[in-house]
Amino acid sequence: MDKLIRWVLKNPFLTLTLTAFLILLGVITVYRTPLDAVPDISDTQVIIEARWEGQDPTTIEDQITYPIVSAMLSAPRTKAVRGFSMPNKSLIYVIFEDGTDIYWARSRVLEYLSGINLPEGVSLRLGPDATALGWVFMYALVDTSGKYDLSFLRTFNDFYLRYKILSADGISDVASVGGYLKEYQIDIDPYKLRAYGLTLNDVIKAVKGSNMQSGGRVIEVSERYYMVRGLGYIKSPEDLEKAVIKTDPESGASIKLGDVAIVQVGSALQEGAADLDGKGEVVGGIVIMRNGENALRVIDNVKRVLSETSLPEGVKFVITYDRSELIKEAVSTLFKTLIKESITVLIVVAIFLFTIRGSLPIVVFLPIALIIPYIFMYAMRITTNIMSLGGMALSIGVMVDAGIVMVENAFKHMEKNPPKTFGEKFEIVYKAISEVAPSLFFSLAIITISFLPVFALTGEEGRLFKPLAFTKTLTMAVATVLSITLMPVLILLILPNRVRSEEQNPINVILHKLYEPVFRISVKYPYVVIGVWLVMSVMAFFILRRIPSEFMPPLNEGSLLYMPSSVAGVPLDKGIEILRKQDSILKTFPEVERVFGKIGRADNPTDPASLSMIETTILLKPEKEWRKGMTIEKLIAEMNEKVQFPGWMNTWGMPIRIRVDMLSTGIRTPLGVKVLGNDPYKVESLAVEVERILSGLKETQTAFADRSAKMLYVDIIPKREKLAEYGLNVSDLMGIIGRVIGGMPLDYAVEGRERYPIRVRLARDFRDEVEDIRDLEFITPTGAVVSFGNVADIKISQAPSMIKSDNGFIASYVYVVPKGDIGMDEYVERAQRVLKENLKLPPGYSFVFSGQYENLKRAQQTMGIIIPLAIIIIFILLYMNFRSFFKSMLVILSVPFTLFGAFGLMYILGYKMSIASWVGVIALLGLAAELGVVMIMFLDLGLKEHPTDPLSGIYEGALRRLRPKVMTATTTFMSLIPIMFETEIGSSVMKRLAAPMIGGVFFAMILVLVVYPAIYKVIYGRGK
């Protein structure tokens, strides 16, 4: 290391040139590194959508969902498989392990799907190649003129606007929500059908035969070629009415479709609806970003396309969700924090050194050390987000420590022997830096390497904190290298030959006067000091036990997601009425900019919502426009009080947080209970019982079992003997049920780019009542007339409208929100005890706690490994530096004392112990070790200068070298303070990271200044 320092001092031009090149490269990569709000913390998922028209959820579950789920469970790297069976379709979510490439996962899913035998008529497709963070932009089409109905707006969105947006880079899909889908409806009069002696198959054949096109290759006319084509696609309901079903051979008269049916254009059955600000139904769109894309660039592309799109007169776009605002605000918040921290550090250095020129090496060093890491971030595809910038923010105070000590030591040497020539200055700077460089290099290496265990985090917490760990490690590694290369050159070239002595600095004089009596008490009563140290170290663990736990602190995203669920199923029109009332109430809050609500699901596999679920996105105004004293917690509480509707249970959260939770565990609240079994009715009844038991716990704020709305079914059960008498099979009867009563699509009308289904079914007058269906007559292929009541039993029954499954078991979820003053661990422990005592589970049924609790337990287990691992790494590095077991253990044994400060400040601030806080604790371990190394280094230098009088050596190391120790601790401490005063987006996570570091560094400073001299007095002390 001495040779390297001498080389850079002898070649300052080359060192500065190389540094300038790296600065230029760093500035370029700063502008090229993508921006995002948070890292993509969602699991790799592949969604399978299976459609089987006319089938009920039970049939869908048994014949589609279960076979697919059971096959996917055996696919490699599969972590979980969840299924949703609903009328006409099934959605299966296949969740893969960390690090699985999404396109590899999609190919495996397709491979396993190819080996599954599914019923005829089932169509399969994969959902978008997107994650839970894919919903980046939403909009609504609003007709201000009153000219257009919802069907027109939905058609415009589906067949024009959607394709315009899809043409932009980075878009995986655009999902429509709300409005009415157009379809051709053929309502048959069964009496007219019978009167003409026609069968259903005659009608079906006529419909299909009237909607087709054909090509006749080419003909040659007058030496020119003409392509022959037959244009037979229907253009209007009148075209269908003219379709010939049968011709009378005697009279030649044709029986047309219009003679036996009413043909009209109508609206298909709605799966969902949307509302804007409580003013009425609108058509909306959800832009889904492709996995791995740059969200900010994608949203800019969408806005550009929308700005270039011509809309029908009187129709306008209204943005209902825009993540780019979150990204810009979050990154802006952290950039401001970095600037504040940097200024704070520079002010502290200038005050302690009491010279502007003396602090210039630090002023130059700091921005360079922050810019160069961007080169590696760009190469490693790490986005600029609140976590990656947070890693830099945590490093600012520490990364200048080596430079501070080097500058201060150079000051000390120049005070004793002011250089007269550049050569003398060279030797003084070289000697001063070489004296402290090895220990400083090791202390920075300790901070850098001790944070490496954070990379062992897995799951969501790993994806969240690895960017922070990368940037913190990169920043510290760059700072470590620059400290022994660039910093010596800056000190040599910038520091003046004559410096003001430490005694001339009033700050240092005050510090000496304050510290000297403390030092004398410490060395006079060393055993008392050591005893207090040990007691406080033990107390740290008692404080920890009193701090509640949580998985992750809330991240203010600048918008809210309100998700009420109906206890019982509601008709769509009633649900829309509730949606409008809720939205209009929420819009009255002065903090609210816009309210966009939807009931049911969007037309996309990423949305499994049922008609009993509402999702309302609430865009909030900037906090500076809020009422005085209003916080996000108070606002949610006020809103929740205003939107209490009978039969609806409210859930509140942030859009990204809730969507990630729903993907990773299926639970949309912080905590949930999954009841698993084989019978949907039994599983649901057990879930309701879990709700009742947990609601009785005083620690429970809300508990709500996700009841599946009951659908009424008309069950038509074939009488096989009767069918045989008429020469019919079950398939004949089922075909009539599906086509005439159910109205399955027979064909599609092609109108340019647009496609609309053609449905044949009984006119409403003949299917309104069960008796109508029972009396309904049809003609058999043999010409016999038979009624449904003759060949089938018809009865009314109830069954679930949706069946959920979790890893092959039928599942029902209980959503739980514990009260804010209890930790998740403690709540689950009590809840498990109460459930085991009061819930009677039949054989084959079980319950598990899920939601963020799953992530918390996994993260706690990992932390139980990586924190001891970090301590072991620190010990090894300390031993490599000191070559002394005693000194290495002295630093390690200081950890509990610093934790007293860390946990104490967390407790005072009312913060829960989250994974973010534990990551802060890991960072604190390295900081505490660094301060210990610096103190021991100066104590050893003092003992070396006074070999015959150790007490004087301790005095020299502690008191005479007070400035560098206080400077390093103060810069670290003060650099973190600005974080605690931030209130903008992204600040909540950073506060939980910084709080244990601030409390710990403060007590680490007390440790090195008070306890270390006492220990050295006991071990080495003699003299006066």
Show where each model-derived region lies.
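Interfacial segments of transmembrane alpha-helices in multi-pass membrane proteins
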Residues: 2, 6-13, 328-385, 452, ...
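Interfacial helix-loop-helix hairpins and adjacent transmembrane helices
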Residues: 1-16, 415-431, 460, 466, ...
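C-terminal transmembrane helical bundles of large multi-pass transporters
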Residues: 323, 638, 642-1023
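Juxtamembrane segments of multi-pass membrane proteins
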Residues: 533-641, 678-699, 720
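Transmembrane alpha-helices and their membrane-interface boundaries in multi-pass membrane transporters
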Residues: 385, 395-411, 436-456, 464-503, ...
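Signature of alpha-helical transmembrane segments and their immediate interfacial
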Residues: 1-35, 430, 434-436, 503-553, ...
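Cytosolic juxtamembrane regions of multi-pass inner-membrane proteins
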Residues: 307, 312, 327-336, 353-354, ...
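Membrane-proximal extracytoplasmic
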Residues: 1-342, 384, 463, 624, ...
